[in-house]
Amino acid sequence: MYIRTVLDRALELRDRRSSSQGKDMIRQAVEYINGHYTDENLSLKEVAGYTNVSANYFSAVFSQEMQQTFVEYLTKKRMERAKELLRQGDKRSAEIAAEVGSKDPHYFSFVFRKTQGCTPRDYRMGGRRG
């Protein structure tokens, strides 16, 4: 019975440490993403490398801790910034796409419409749904 109790406590401690390390890694990754999301080449592999883990491990832990995938988080971050830019002025959609890290303005418009429920132009004109 004593050995069982010691083993249970050891496993509990290991799990707590593992969870804490995962949360620290995610905090570090989110800070990195938030500082680099406008880089059109930002990738899961790059962020995983920044946090010193494999891309597969990073992807699994990120999804589990954040309740969304890396791509979903990055897209959401970029769309939030795009909405700010659309509200602030009259930059063209292609300029905004480049500013938020999108390589292709047409794909940016497609993703914006898919995630926000309206085109960037409609959003600017007042059809703000997202």
Go through each PLM region and give its residues.
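Hydrophobic, helix-rich cores of sensory/ligand-binding and other regulatory modules
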Residues: 1-25
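Basic, amphipathic alpha-helical hairpins
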Residues: 8-16, 30-42, 62-66, 83-91, ...
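N-terminal positioning helix adjacent to the helix-turn-helix/winged-helix DNA-binding module
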Residues: 21-29, 75-78
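Type III/flagellar export substrates
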Residues: 21-25, 43-46, 50, 70
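Short helix/strand-capping hinge loops at secondary-structure junctions
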Residues: 36-38, 69-70, 119-120
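Append "Primarily bacterial transcriptional regulators
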Residues: 46-53, 58, 62, 96-102, ...
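Terminal helix-turn-helix DNA-binding modules in bacterial transcription factors
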Residues: 64-103, 125-130
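…primarily DNA-binding HTH/wHTH and HhH modules…
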Residues: 110-130
